[in-house]
Amino acid sequence: MAAFTNQAALTYNGVTIPSNIVTGELLETLTITKDALDSQYTAASSVTYIINLINSGAAALTGLTLTDNLGAYLSGGRTLTPLSYVSGTARYYVNGVAQAAPDVTAGPPLTITGLSVPAGGNATLLYEALPNQFAPLDAGRTILNTASVSGAALPNAVEAEQTITVRREPVLRIRKALSPASVSPGGQLTYTFTIENTGNTPATAAELLAVTDTFDPILSGLTVSFNGAAWAPTTNYTYNATTGAFATVAGQITVPAATYTQNAATGEWSATPGVSTLTVTGTVA
């Protein structure tokens, strides 16, 4: 909304007398809101944004352009853009009716042109953006995203903001290694399970992590360690020497959170995973 002031003058007998100053407010004909379907983001999932435009005026607004800064922020004297438009995801509705796909320039900034909002009506835009290498992922970080709409029919651009917060969660993967690759009956075999966490939150006992496997060939005389510390059967793991079925007790495995660093030269973020290692050694039956 824009404020305006106005003052009159009364002139008589060569004298000018000013009136008081009145102040008013010019209501915007077009209003905008911006929302995200999910208020949290991760490195692997796109964010769907919803833009709603409402025209309270008596005339249609045509030739409008939406500009989205995709969360651009300053870092180290440079502008970094943490979101990338997902090609082909833009959808455009007028009074709830689907329209032809609008003209989109991915940017950054993202621009969508040729928009119209009927008199007394509304238009809705939906599109997706994916966090990229400039999106911070450590716990507590946010992306502030601004969209604005401009056009010849508008005295001023209208804009709306939306903030999304990085999701706090562990993100786990497991790798299995065998040593040696060739073994004879009666020889020793070692399985090493490496569990990595690229998430910003440690995997604690509350997550009830468990590793299960069926060893073939079956192993006897098992020794098990976790991060170098010896484990005890029943307390930490179970093993059926007849079937080869092995399982850790749920909650015994924990994995620290990843650490994140931002490259001073490029502004890109990288993650160093938190790592835990489970080692199982036995004799081939």
Task: Give the residues covered by each predicted segment.
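Exported/extracytosolic protein signature
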Residues: 1-285
